[in-house]
Amino acid sequence: MNVSRCRIIAVGKVRKGWVQEGVELYLKRLPGLTVVELKDSSREKEAEAIRAALRSDELPVMLMEQGTPLASIPFAQRLERLGNERLAFVIGGADGLTDELKAAARWQLSLSPMTFPHELARLLLLEQLFRAQAILQGSPYHRA
């Protein structure tokens, strides 16, 4: 897994200090990972901004409650199988993603069957990306 080939496209700012601390911690642990932060707006305007932010060479991974849930090891294995594919993990705003964006996803991922605020979803995704990297490198960080 090459995190420099991954981006997170997220609607909304991280407003809670404790969440921002966690985000900064994992971004330091994942050098090369980029976060593109988009402005909160209507769902349709957010979808337009997401489409504009996506690169043509990226595989869009939409984070959504109805997506496929994966435990940490299968998540790491899937990232490893994707090899050098460029990935864009997309986190929608408070109203979620449009049906059009969901349909355009090559991969629909669920972090949990529960719903989280978008800023918390960003932190959870960063931690899971770090954990996936640790699993693939044989690091003792993952102790399941």
Swiss-Prot record:
Q: Name one Pfam family in it.
A: SPOUT_MTase
Superkingdom in the source lineage: Bacteria
Q: State its location(s).
A: Cytoplasm
> Does S-adenosyl-L-methionine show up as a keyword for this record?
yes
Give GO MF terms, alphabetically.
rRNA (pseudouridine-N3-)-methyltransferase activity
Q: Top-level EC class, please?
A: transferase
EC code: 2.1.1.177
Q: Which GO terms describe its cellular component?
A: cytoplasm
Annotated positions binding S-adenosyl-L-methionine? G92, L111, S112, P113, M114, T115, F116
What's the catalysed reaction? Answer: pseudouridine(1915) in 23S rRNA + S-adenosyl-L-methionine = N(3)-methylpseudouridine(1915) in 23S rRNA + S-adenosyl-L-homocysteine + H(+)
UniProt cross-references to SUPFAM superfamilies, sorted A to Z: alpha/beta knot
Q: Does the keyword Methyltransferase apply?
A: yes
**Where the protein is mainly located, per its record?**
cytoplasm
Keyword entries, A-Z: Cytoplasm, Methyltransferase, rRNA processing, S-adenosyl-L-methionine, Transferase
Q: Read off the HAMAP family from this record.
A: 23SrRNA_methyltr_H (MF_00658)
Summarizing the function annotation, the protein's role is: Specifically methylates the pseudouridine at position 1915 (m3Psi1915) in 23S rRNA.
Which family is it part of? Answer: Belongs to the RNA methyltransferase RlmH family.
**Protein's name in the database:** Ribosomal RNA large subunit methyltransferase H
Q: Could you tell me which species this protein originates from? A: Synechococcus sp. (strain WH7803)
Instruction: Identify the gene encoding this protein.
Output: rlmH
